[in-house]
């Protein structure tokens, strides 16, 4: 009889412990359900890249002196610089410049060491294509004006954690009516219907 009571007592303790574990898990779940979503509705809302973001390289053909410093400092010798020596002016004449962004590691060395500042990093990060050969940008494609998220009228630019009031570090301790980073899908539907 004593052995049976001990088994019942052990079973009760284990049941209470299991209930505690389930309660702890559910408390975490309910805590996350109470929080606001921080999802950004990507095609319609985009986060503004940071100040030192290294995106697509912008190239200014007129400033380039074909010194090939960018090729020498590139860890993978990526930029292709085609030039010829002009005997009349005794200077290099640039014929062609290209970078394959399918191979580029966006380290920024070419931009940093360029003596004429003809290369610069942009905010563009949407370089996806269906064919990898389309990522090989020549001097014309590299020279097109850089795209800025803030200039696109079809996109709502968002700064990361821009909705946090001053002094608040935790994005989950906000009042319910505070502006948020990403709009809920139902809010987007209401905007289009209105």
Curated annotation (Swiss-Prot):
Residue ranges for the region (Disordered) are 174-194
Per UniProt, where does [4Fe-4S] cluster 2 bind? 74, 104, 107, 110
Instruction: Give a yes or no for keyword Calcium in this entry.
Output: no
**Coiled coil where?**
none
Chief location = membrane
| Signal sequence range | none
4Fe-4S ferredoxin-type domain residues: 55-84, 95-124
List the membrane topology term(s).
Peripheral membrane protein
Where is the protein situated, by its record's location annotation? Cellular thylakoid membrane
Needed cofactors: [4Fe-4S] cluster
Protein family per UniProt: Belongs to the complex I 23 kDa subunit family.
* Self-association state and partner proteins as the record states: NDH-1 is composed of at least 11 different subunits.
Q: What is this protein called?
A: NAD(P)H-quinone oxidoreductase subunit I
Q: What species does this protein belong to?
A: Trichormus variabilis (strain ATCC 29413 / PCC 7937)
Q: Give the classification, highest ranks.
A: Bacteria, Bacillati, Cyanobacteriota, Cyanophyceae, Nostocales
Gene behind the chain: ndhI
